[in-house]
């Protein structure tokens, strides 16, 4: 690193701090990594330091960074046409719709293309209400569905508290207890969770409820697993009352859990799927809402009241077509399942070394380590929706992780482990060695 490099890095960081806003952050005191380029599971800053990316950006860069095949596909499309109105069609749009229909189960054969995950969720909510003529949407506490107004109201994440007074109406939340802290066994948890949902539906009036919206697998709330058989029960309840089931696969979709979609681990078929992140792996902003033939048929002779200027953007569609091809060509979904099993084995070994590791929850390569102060009481190292002074230990752990050359998502008492699907055993070992060293800080606060 020389003086010119330091000067360049400082200028890049300062321009970003001076002229841009950072999401979910206090704007003072931010210390971002100035990323120059990425390759596979690694990011490189302007000083030449390498970071292993153990959260795939924000759980979206599933194929890894810097894949030239996506660049080439984007260039080819831009050399033909970069934009057409959604009223026109392109080869990329049709190819993508056809491929998505092939990989989605059941009769989920129609795609409405959006610009991100939140817009996929917003349009799912809108369409569910229009299709059913009902107004209420049921969602889970401790969930996240995006940061737009409707998506944030739908979520059960505490980041919405600051805008609760202005939130979109008619979202009803229900609780699903956390298995790690449930004292009465998984079978009883399933019974209680199902009974609770049935009570809420009865209290709210089933004829008022348009849809139940759930994540395919829990992500940023802490990878909180559904009890075995839960989603099948929810599917049956929805069928009984004419309620639609919407699965949010924005984070858990596209191989992240070892299957194309997280809900496929539960052997169900929803009525709609919201997707984004892994659809283009962050190479371009893009999203999609897949709907059943039954829902789509309602609009054969009636106007579909959905629209976006950038819907079915040709360049984004081309990137998505190539991305889906890479999943298959590189066997990434199979690798996610295999590496997920390997991670389970290795974290179990880490538990023997670190008294602060309370639990590890994953499905494929969507997982997190939960740190605790006491394994017997399961007191978390930082509480739910922790205040700044309650995050001191975890902030020190996060700082050490970054110092040692890792980028990952640390939230409350969770350290997320969600590397790109191309990750190898050797790279997992490299990443876990960094996490292990950082966790020694937390070990000092156990009792």
Where are these regions (language model features)?
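Conserved N-terminal phosphate-binding loop of PLP-dependent enzymes in the Aspartate aminotransferase
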Residues: 2-447
